Structures are given as structure tokens and as C-alpha cells.
Design a protein with these regions (language model features):
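Amphipathic alpha-helical packing segments from all-alpha helical-bundle domains
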Residues: 2-3, 45-71, 81-85, 116-120
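Hydrophobic alpha-helical connector segments
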Residues: 2-34, 53-54, 58-60, 80-84
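Short, flexible helix-adjacent loops and helix caps
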Residues: 2-9, 41, 70-73, 99, ...
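Helical hydrophobic small-molecule/effector-binding pocket
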Residues: 3, 16-38, 45-48, 91-99, ...
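A short, mixed-charge helix-start or loop-turn motif at secondary-structure junctions
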Residues: 4, 43-47, 107-111
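C-terminal peripheral helix-coil segments that are non-catalytic and often amphipathic
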Residues: 28, 59, 63-71, 89-142
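A general secondary-structure junction signal
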Residues: 39-40, 82
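Short beta-strand "wing" residues that participate in macromolecule-binding interfaces
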Residues: 76
Length: 142
């Protein structure tokens, strides 16, 4: 569990690369995604296994987002906790709900074509997470 919570801390600074990194991590560890779903079916309003340690790890992840915002790598006009939650959702949803993925895209989340397309989508979407100056610099590199 500690290793999975470390994703936020070890992710690349660049928003596009960070989303691609998380998506790749979720694709490689579908069992973890399923375990989180199973856990969610329980009584999650109460403490979960390793609650204090996991909360600390997630707060460290929020701190990393806040720090990247302060450095001008991510937009500063969005709440860092909500931004991290959205990033987790964008990168794990296809593995967590493969039926939606297949129904919406015609591909399974395990299909290489889906992985390639979703990674490209996440990179493009991440452009909107960058401050305007960072966005212009990223576009110039393409």
C-alpha cells in the first residue's frame, strides 16, 4: 500500500508526464485498482486498513501538487486536493471500470491501442493544467 501511495510523490514534475506515469502505473497494477474498489464496497466512512499512514501519504501527495503549483508547473487557481483527486480518477478509471472503457471507446483497457490513445489524451489534457507560460513552452517543444 505504501508503494502505491508513493505514486504521487515519485511522479514526474511535468503535468503531462505525471498523468502518463500514473496511468501506466495503474495499467501495470490492476490488482491494486481492484483492491481499492473492493475496499470501497465496505464501510469506508470508518477508518480503512492503514488509514493514518495512507492519509499521511496522500497529504504528502497534495503537498507535492501544491509545491508544483508554487513553482509554476501547475495552475495555481485550482485546489491541490481536488486536482490530485481528478488526476487519480483520470488515470485509474479505465482499469477500475473496464466495462465503461469498452462501451465508450470500443477497446478494452488492456488493449495496446487503448493504452496508446489514452496516454496521448492525458498528455493533451494536461496542457490545460499548466499555467499559460508553461503551456506555451510545451507547445514550442512539439
Amino acid at each position: 500500500m505504501r508503494e502505491r501511495a508513493a505514486w504521487a510523490v515519485t511522479a514526474p514534475d511535468d503535468a503531462a508526464e505525471s498523468l502518463a506515469f500514473w496511468f501506466d502505473s495503474a495499467c501495470r497494477d490492476r490488482d491494486w485498482v481492484r483492491l481499492m474498489e473492493w475496499e470501497a464496497l465496505g464501510r469506508v466512512e470508518h477508518a480503512v486498513n492503514g488509514d493514518a499512514e495512507r492519509r499521511a501519504a496522500f497529504q504528502q501527495g497534495v503537498g507535492q501538487v501544491r509545491e508544483r503549483q508554487a513553482r509554476g508547473l501547475l495552475r495555481a487557481d485550482v485546489d491541490p486536493g481536488h486536482l490530485l483527486l481528478a488526476m487519480v480518477a483520470l488515470t485509474t478509471f479505465p482499469a477500475a471500470f473496464p466495462q465503461f472503457t469498452r462501451l465508450l471507446t470500443g477497446l478494452r483497457p488492456t488493449d495496446q491501442a487503448f493504452v496508446t490513445r489514452h496516454s496521448a489524451f492525458l498528455r493533451r489534457l494536461a496542457d490545460g493544467l499548466r499555467p499559460p507560460r508553461q503551456r506555451q513552452a510545451a507547445e514550442a517543444r512539439r
